[in-house]
């Protein structure tokens, strides 16, 4: 039987390295380890490595093969190992893995105490550059915002809307997903719940009215809370308000430092 040609391992004559090459949007079942336990989820995964100028292509099948061997619940320790294993398997000096997934948290309604799940979008990223590893945590938290100006100028009521507050951070020690959610929800006009009864709806309506926030207030208040946490070295916080009286969003962004 004739040997099958290994085209991607052949030399390339253009003398041009590639910063990152690999796969993206791999849908894969995973377990996620968080402070509140292990969750089963379906993740969207991106896996890339640096490719030297001398090599025509990377070994695409090896990325999926590596994930097929992944059995441990994912946290930053297992992500570090997975990233290092990928770089070694692909014979590279640099590589990145990003894992995006819906994260669910059980919450109790503020008055009735009835429990329900609320979902958050989370991305864990691990990267090795020339032997040095770093990781990033990104969490999108949906909240309620109520406009201070609308409250001030109106005889009754004020416009309010859902907002998405996204925090992306690098830390020098472990920071749990739940901690970032708590930081953001504490600064919102009111947090969201999956299920509310009438007494709960009354509570969240009045709480938002008593705690109005511009989009600028939201990012400043969240940033202040993050700066106070000495584990967090750098971050970006964004807030997008899906304005109920406009057909556009209000947006604010802070990067620290």
Residue locations for each model-derived region?
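N-terminal intrinsically disordered, cationic/polar leader segments
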Residues: 1-257
């Amino acid at each position: 039987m004739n040997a099958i040609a290994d085209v991607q391992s052949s030399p390339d004559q253009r003398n041009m390295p590639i910063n990152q090459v690999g796969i993206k949007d791999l849908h894969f079942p995973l377990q996620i380890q968080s402070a509140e336990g292990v969750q089963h989820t379906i993740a969207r995964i991106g896996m890339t490595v640096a490719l030297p100028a001398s090599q025509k292509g990377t070994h695409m099948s090896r990325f999926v093969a590596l994930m097929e061997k992944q059995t441990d619940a994912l946290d930053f320790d297992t992500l570090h190992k997975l990233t290092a294993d990928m770089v070694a398997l692909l014979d590279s000096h640099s590589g990145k893995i990003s894992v995006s997934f819906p994260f669910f948290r059980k919450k109790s309604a503020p008055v009735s105490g009835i429990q329900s799940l609320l979902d958050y979008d989370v991305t864990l990223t691990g990267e090795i550059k020339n032997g040095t590893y770093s990781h990033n945590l990104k969490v999108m938290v949906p909240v309620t915002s109520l406009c201070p100006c609308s409250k001030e100028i109106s005889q009754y009521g004020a416009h309010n809307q859902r907002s998405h507050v996204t925090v992306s951070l690098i830390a020098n020690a472990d920071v749990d997903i739940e901690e970032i959610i708590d930081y953001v929800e504490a600064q919102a006009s009111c947090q969201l719940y999956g299920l509310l009864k009438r007494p709960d709806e009354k509570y969240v309506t009045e709480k938002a009215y008593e705690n109005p926030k511009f989009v600028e207030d939201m990012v400043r208040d969240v940033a202040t809370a993050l700066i106070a946490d000495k584990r967090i070295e750098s971050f970006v916080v964004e807030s997008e308000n899906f304005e109920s009286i406009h057909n556009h969003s209000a947006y604010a962004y802070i990067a620290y430092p």
